[in-house]
Amino acid sequence: MLETRWHLIRHAPVDNPEGRIYGSSDKSANTSNANAFQLLAQRLPREGIAITSHLKRTQQTLDALISGGLEVSQQIIENRLGEQDFGDWTGKTYEEVRSLFGDAYDKFWITPAKEKPPNGENFIQVIDRVRECILDCTKKFKGRDVICISHGGVIRAALTIALKIEAERALSISVDNLSTTIIDYLHPCENFAGTWRVRCTNVPAI
């Protein structure tokens, strides 16, 4: 049975001592922990297809993995795998958002998958673009290993697809920096319609 394997890795940590919402803003990753990248690189398949988002923290993470020994056959940048856009909340602390947006902030946390920050996007929209990208790439790279360095929201979105769960439930799944989540697509064959399988979630680099 032919499988396409997705190794979903959340980017390296972002230095953010004030706890500001950075979402789709282009923050740098802290890639100083060389040991973590070396250990993670050893566990990943060789000659896989590497896909990052357009945000530099994912590309910096891939560069650090390659420096740690990872070998990839191709590198692709995919805008559809960017983190959720929190609109007017971006760059603010949660306390600042609560003070400035009041009722809208409170309403957001009642149904966080469906509510949209002002001038941003909701998690449902993230799922839609991630689904489109994953299905396209699964077809294009059929039977290959895909090493996807992206974001917490993107990985949760991928799990809604693989597990067929509601968006709200996916938001309760932990996705730590440099953790690995592996999902496989088992391609259709005679008397088999094809399905997703989850191998593991949130496996730490160290």
What is the meaning of each model-derived region?
Residues 1-5, 84-99, 139-144, 160-206:
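Acidic, low-complexity terminal tails and accessory targeting/binding regions
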Residues 2, 45-80, 184-206:
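Conserved histidine-centered catalytic loops in small-molecule metabolism enzymes
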Residues 4-70:
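Active-site-proximal alpha-helix that buttresses catalytic centers in soluble enzyme cores
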Residues 6, 48, 144-150:
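Generic beta-sheet signal
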Residues 12, 152, 203:
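Active-site metal-binding loops of divalent metal-dependent hydrolases
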Residues 15, 57-59, 83-84, 154-156:
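Short, active-site-adjacent cap segments at secondary-structure transitions
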Residues 52-53, 128, 149-150:
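Short beta-strand scaffold positions
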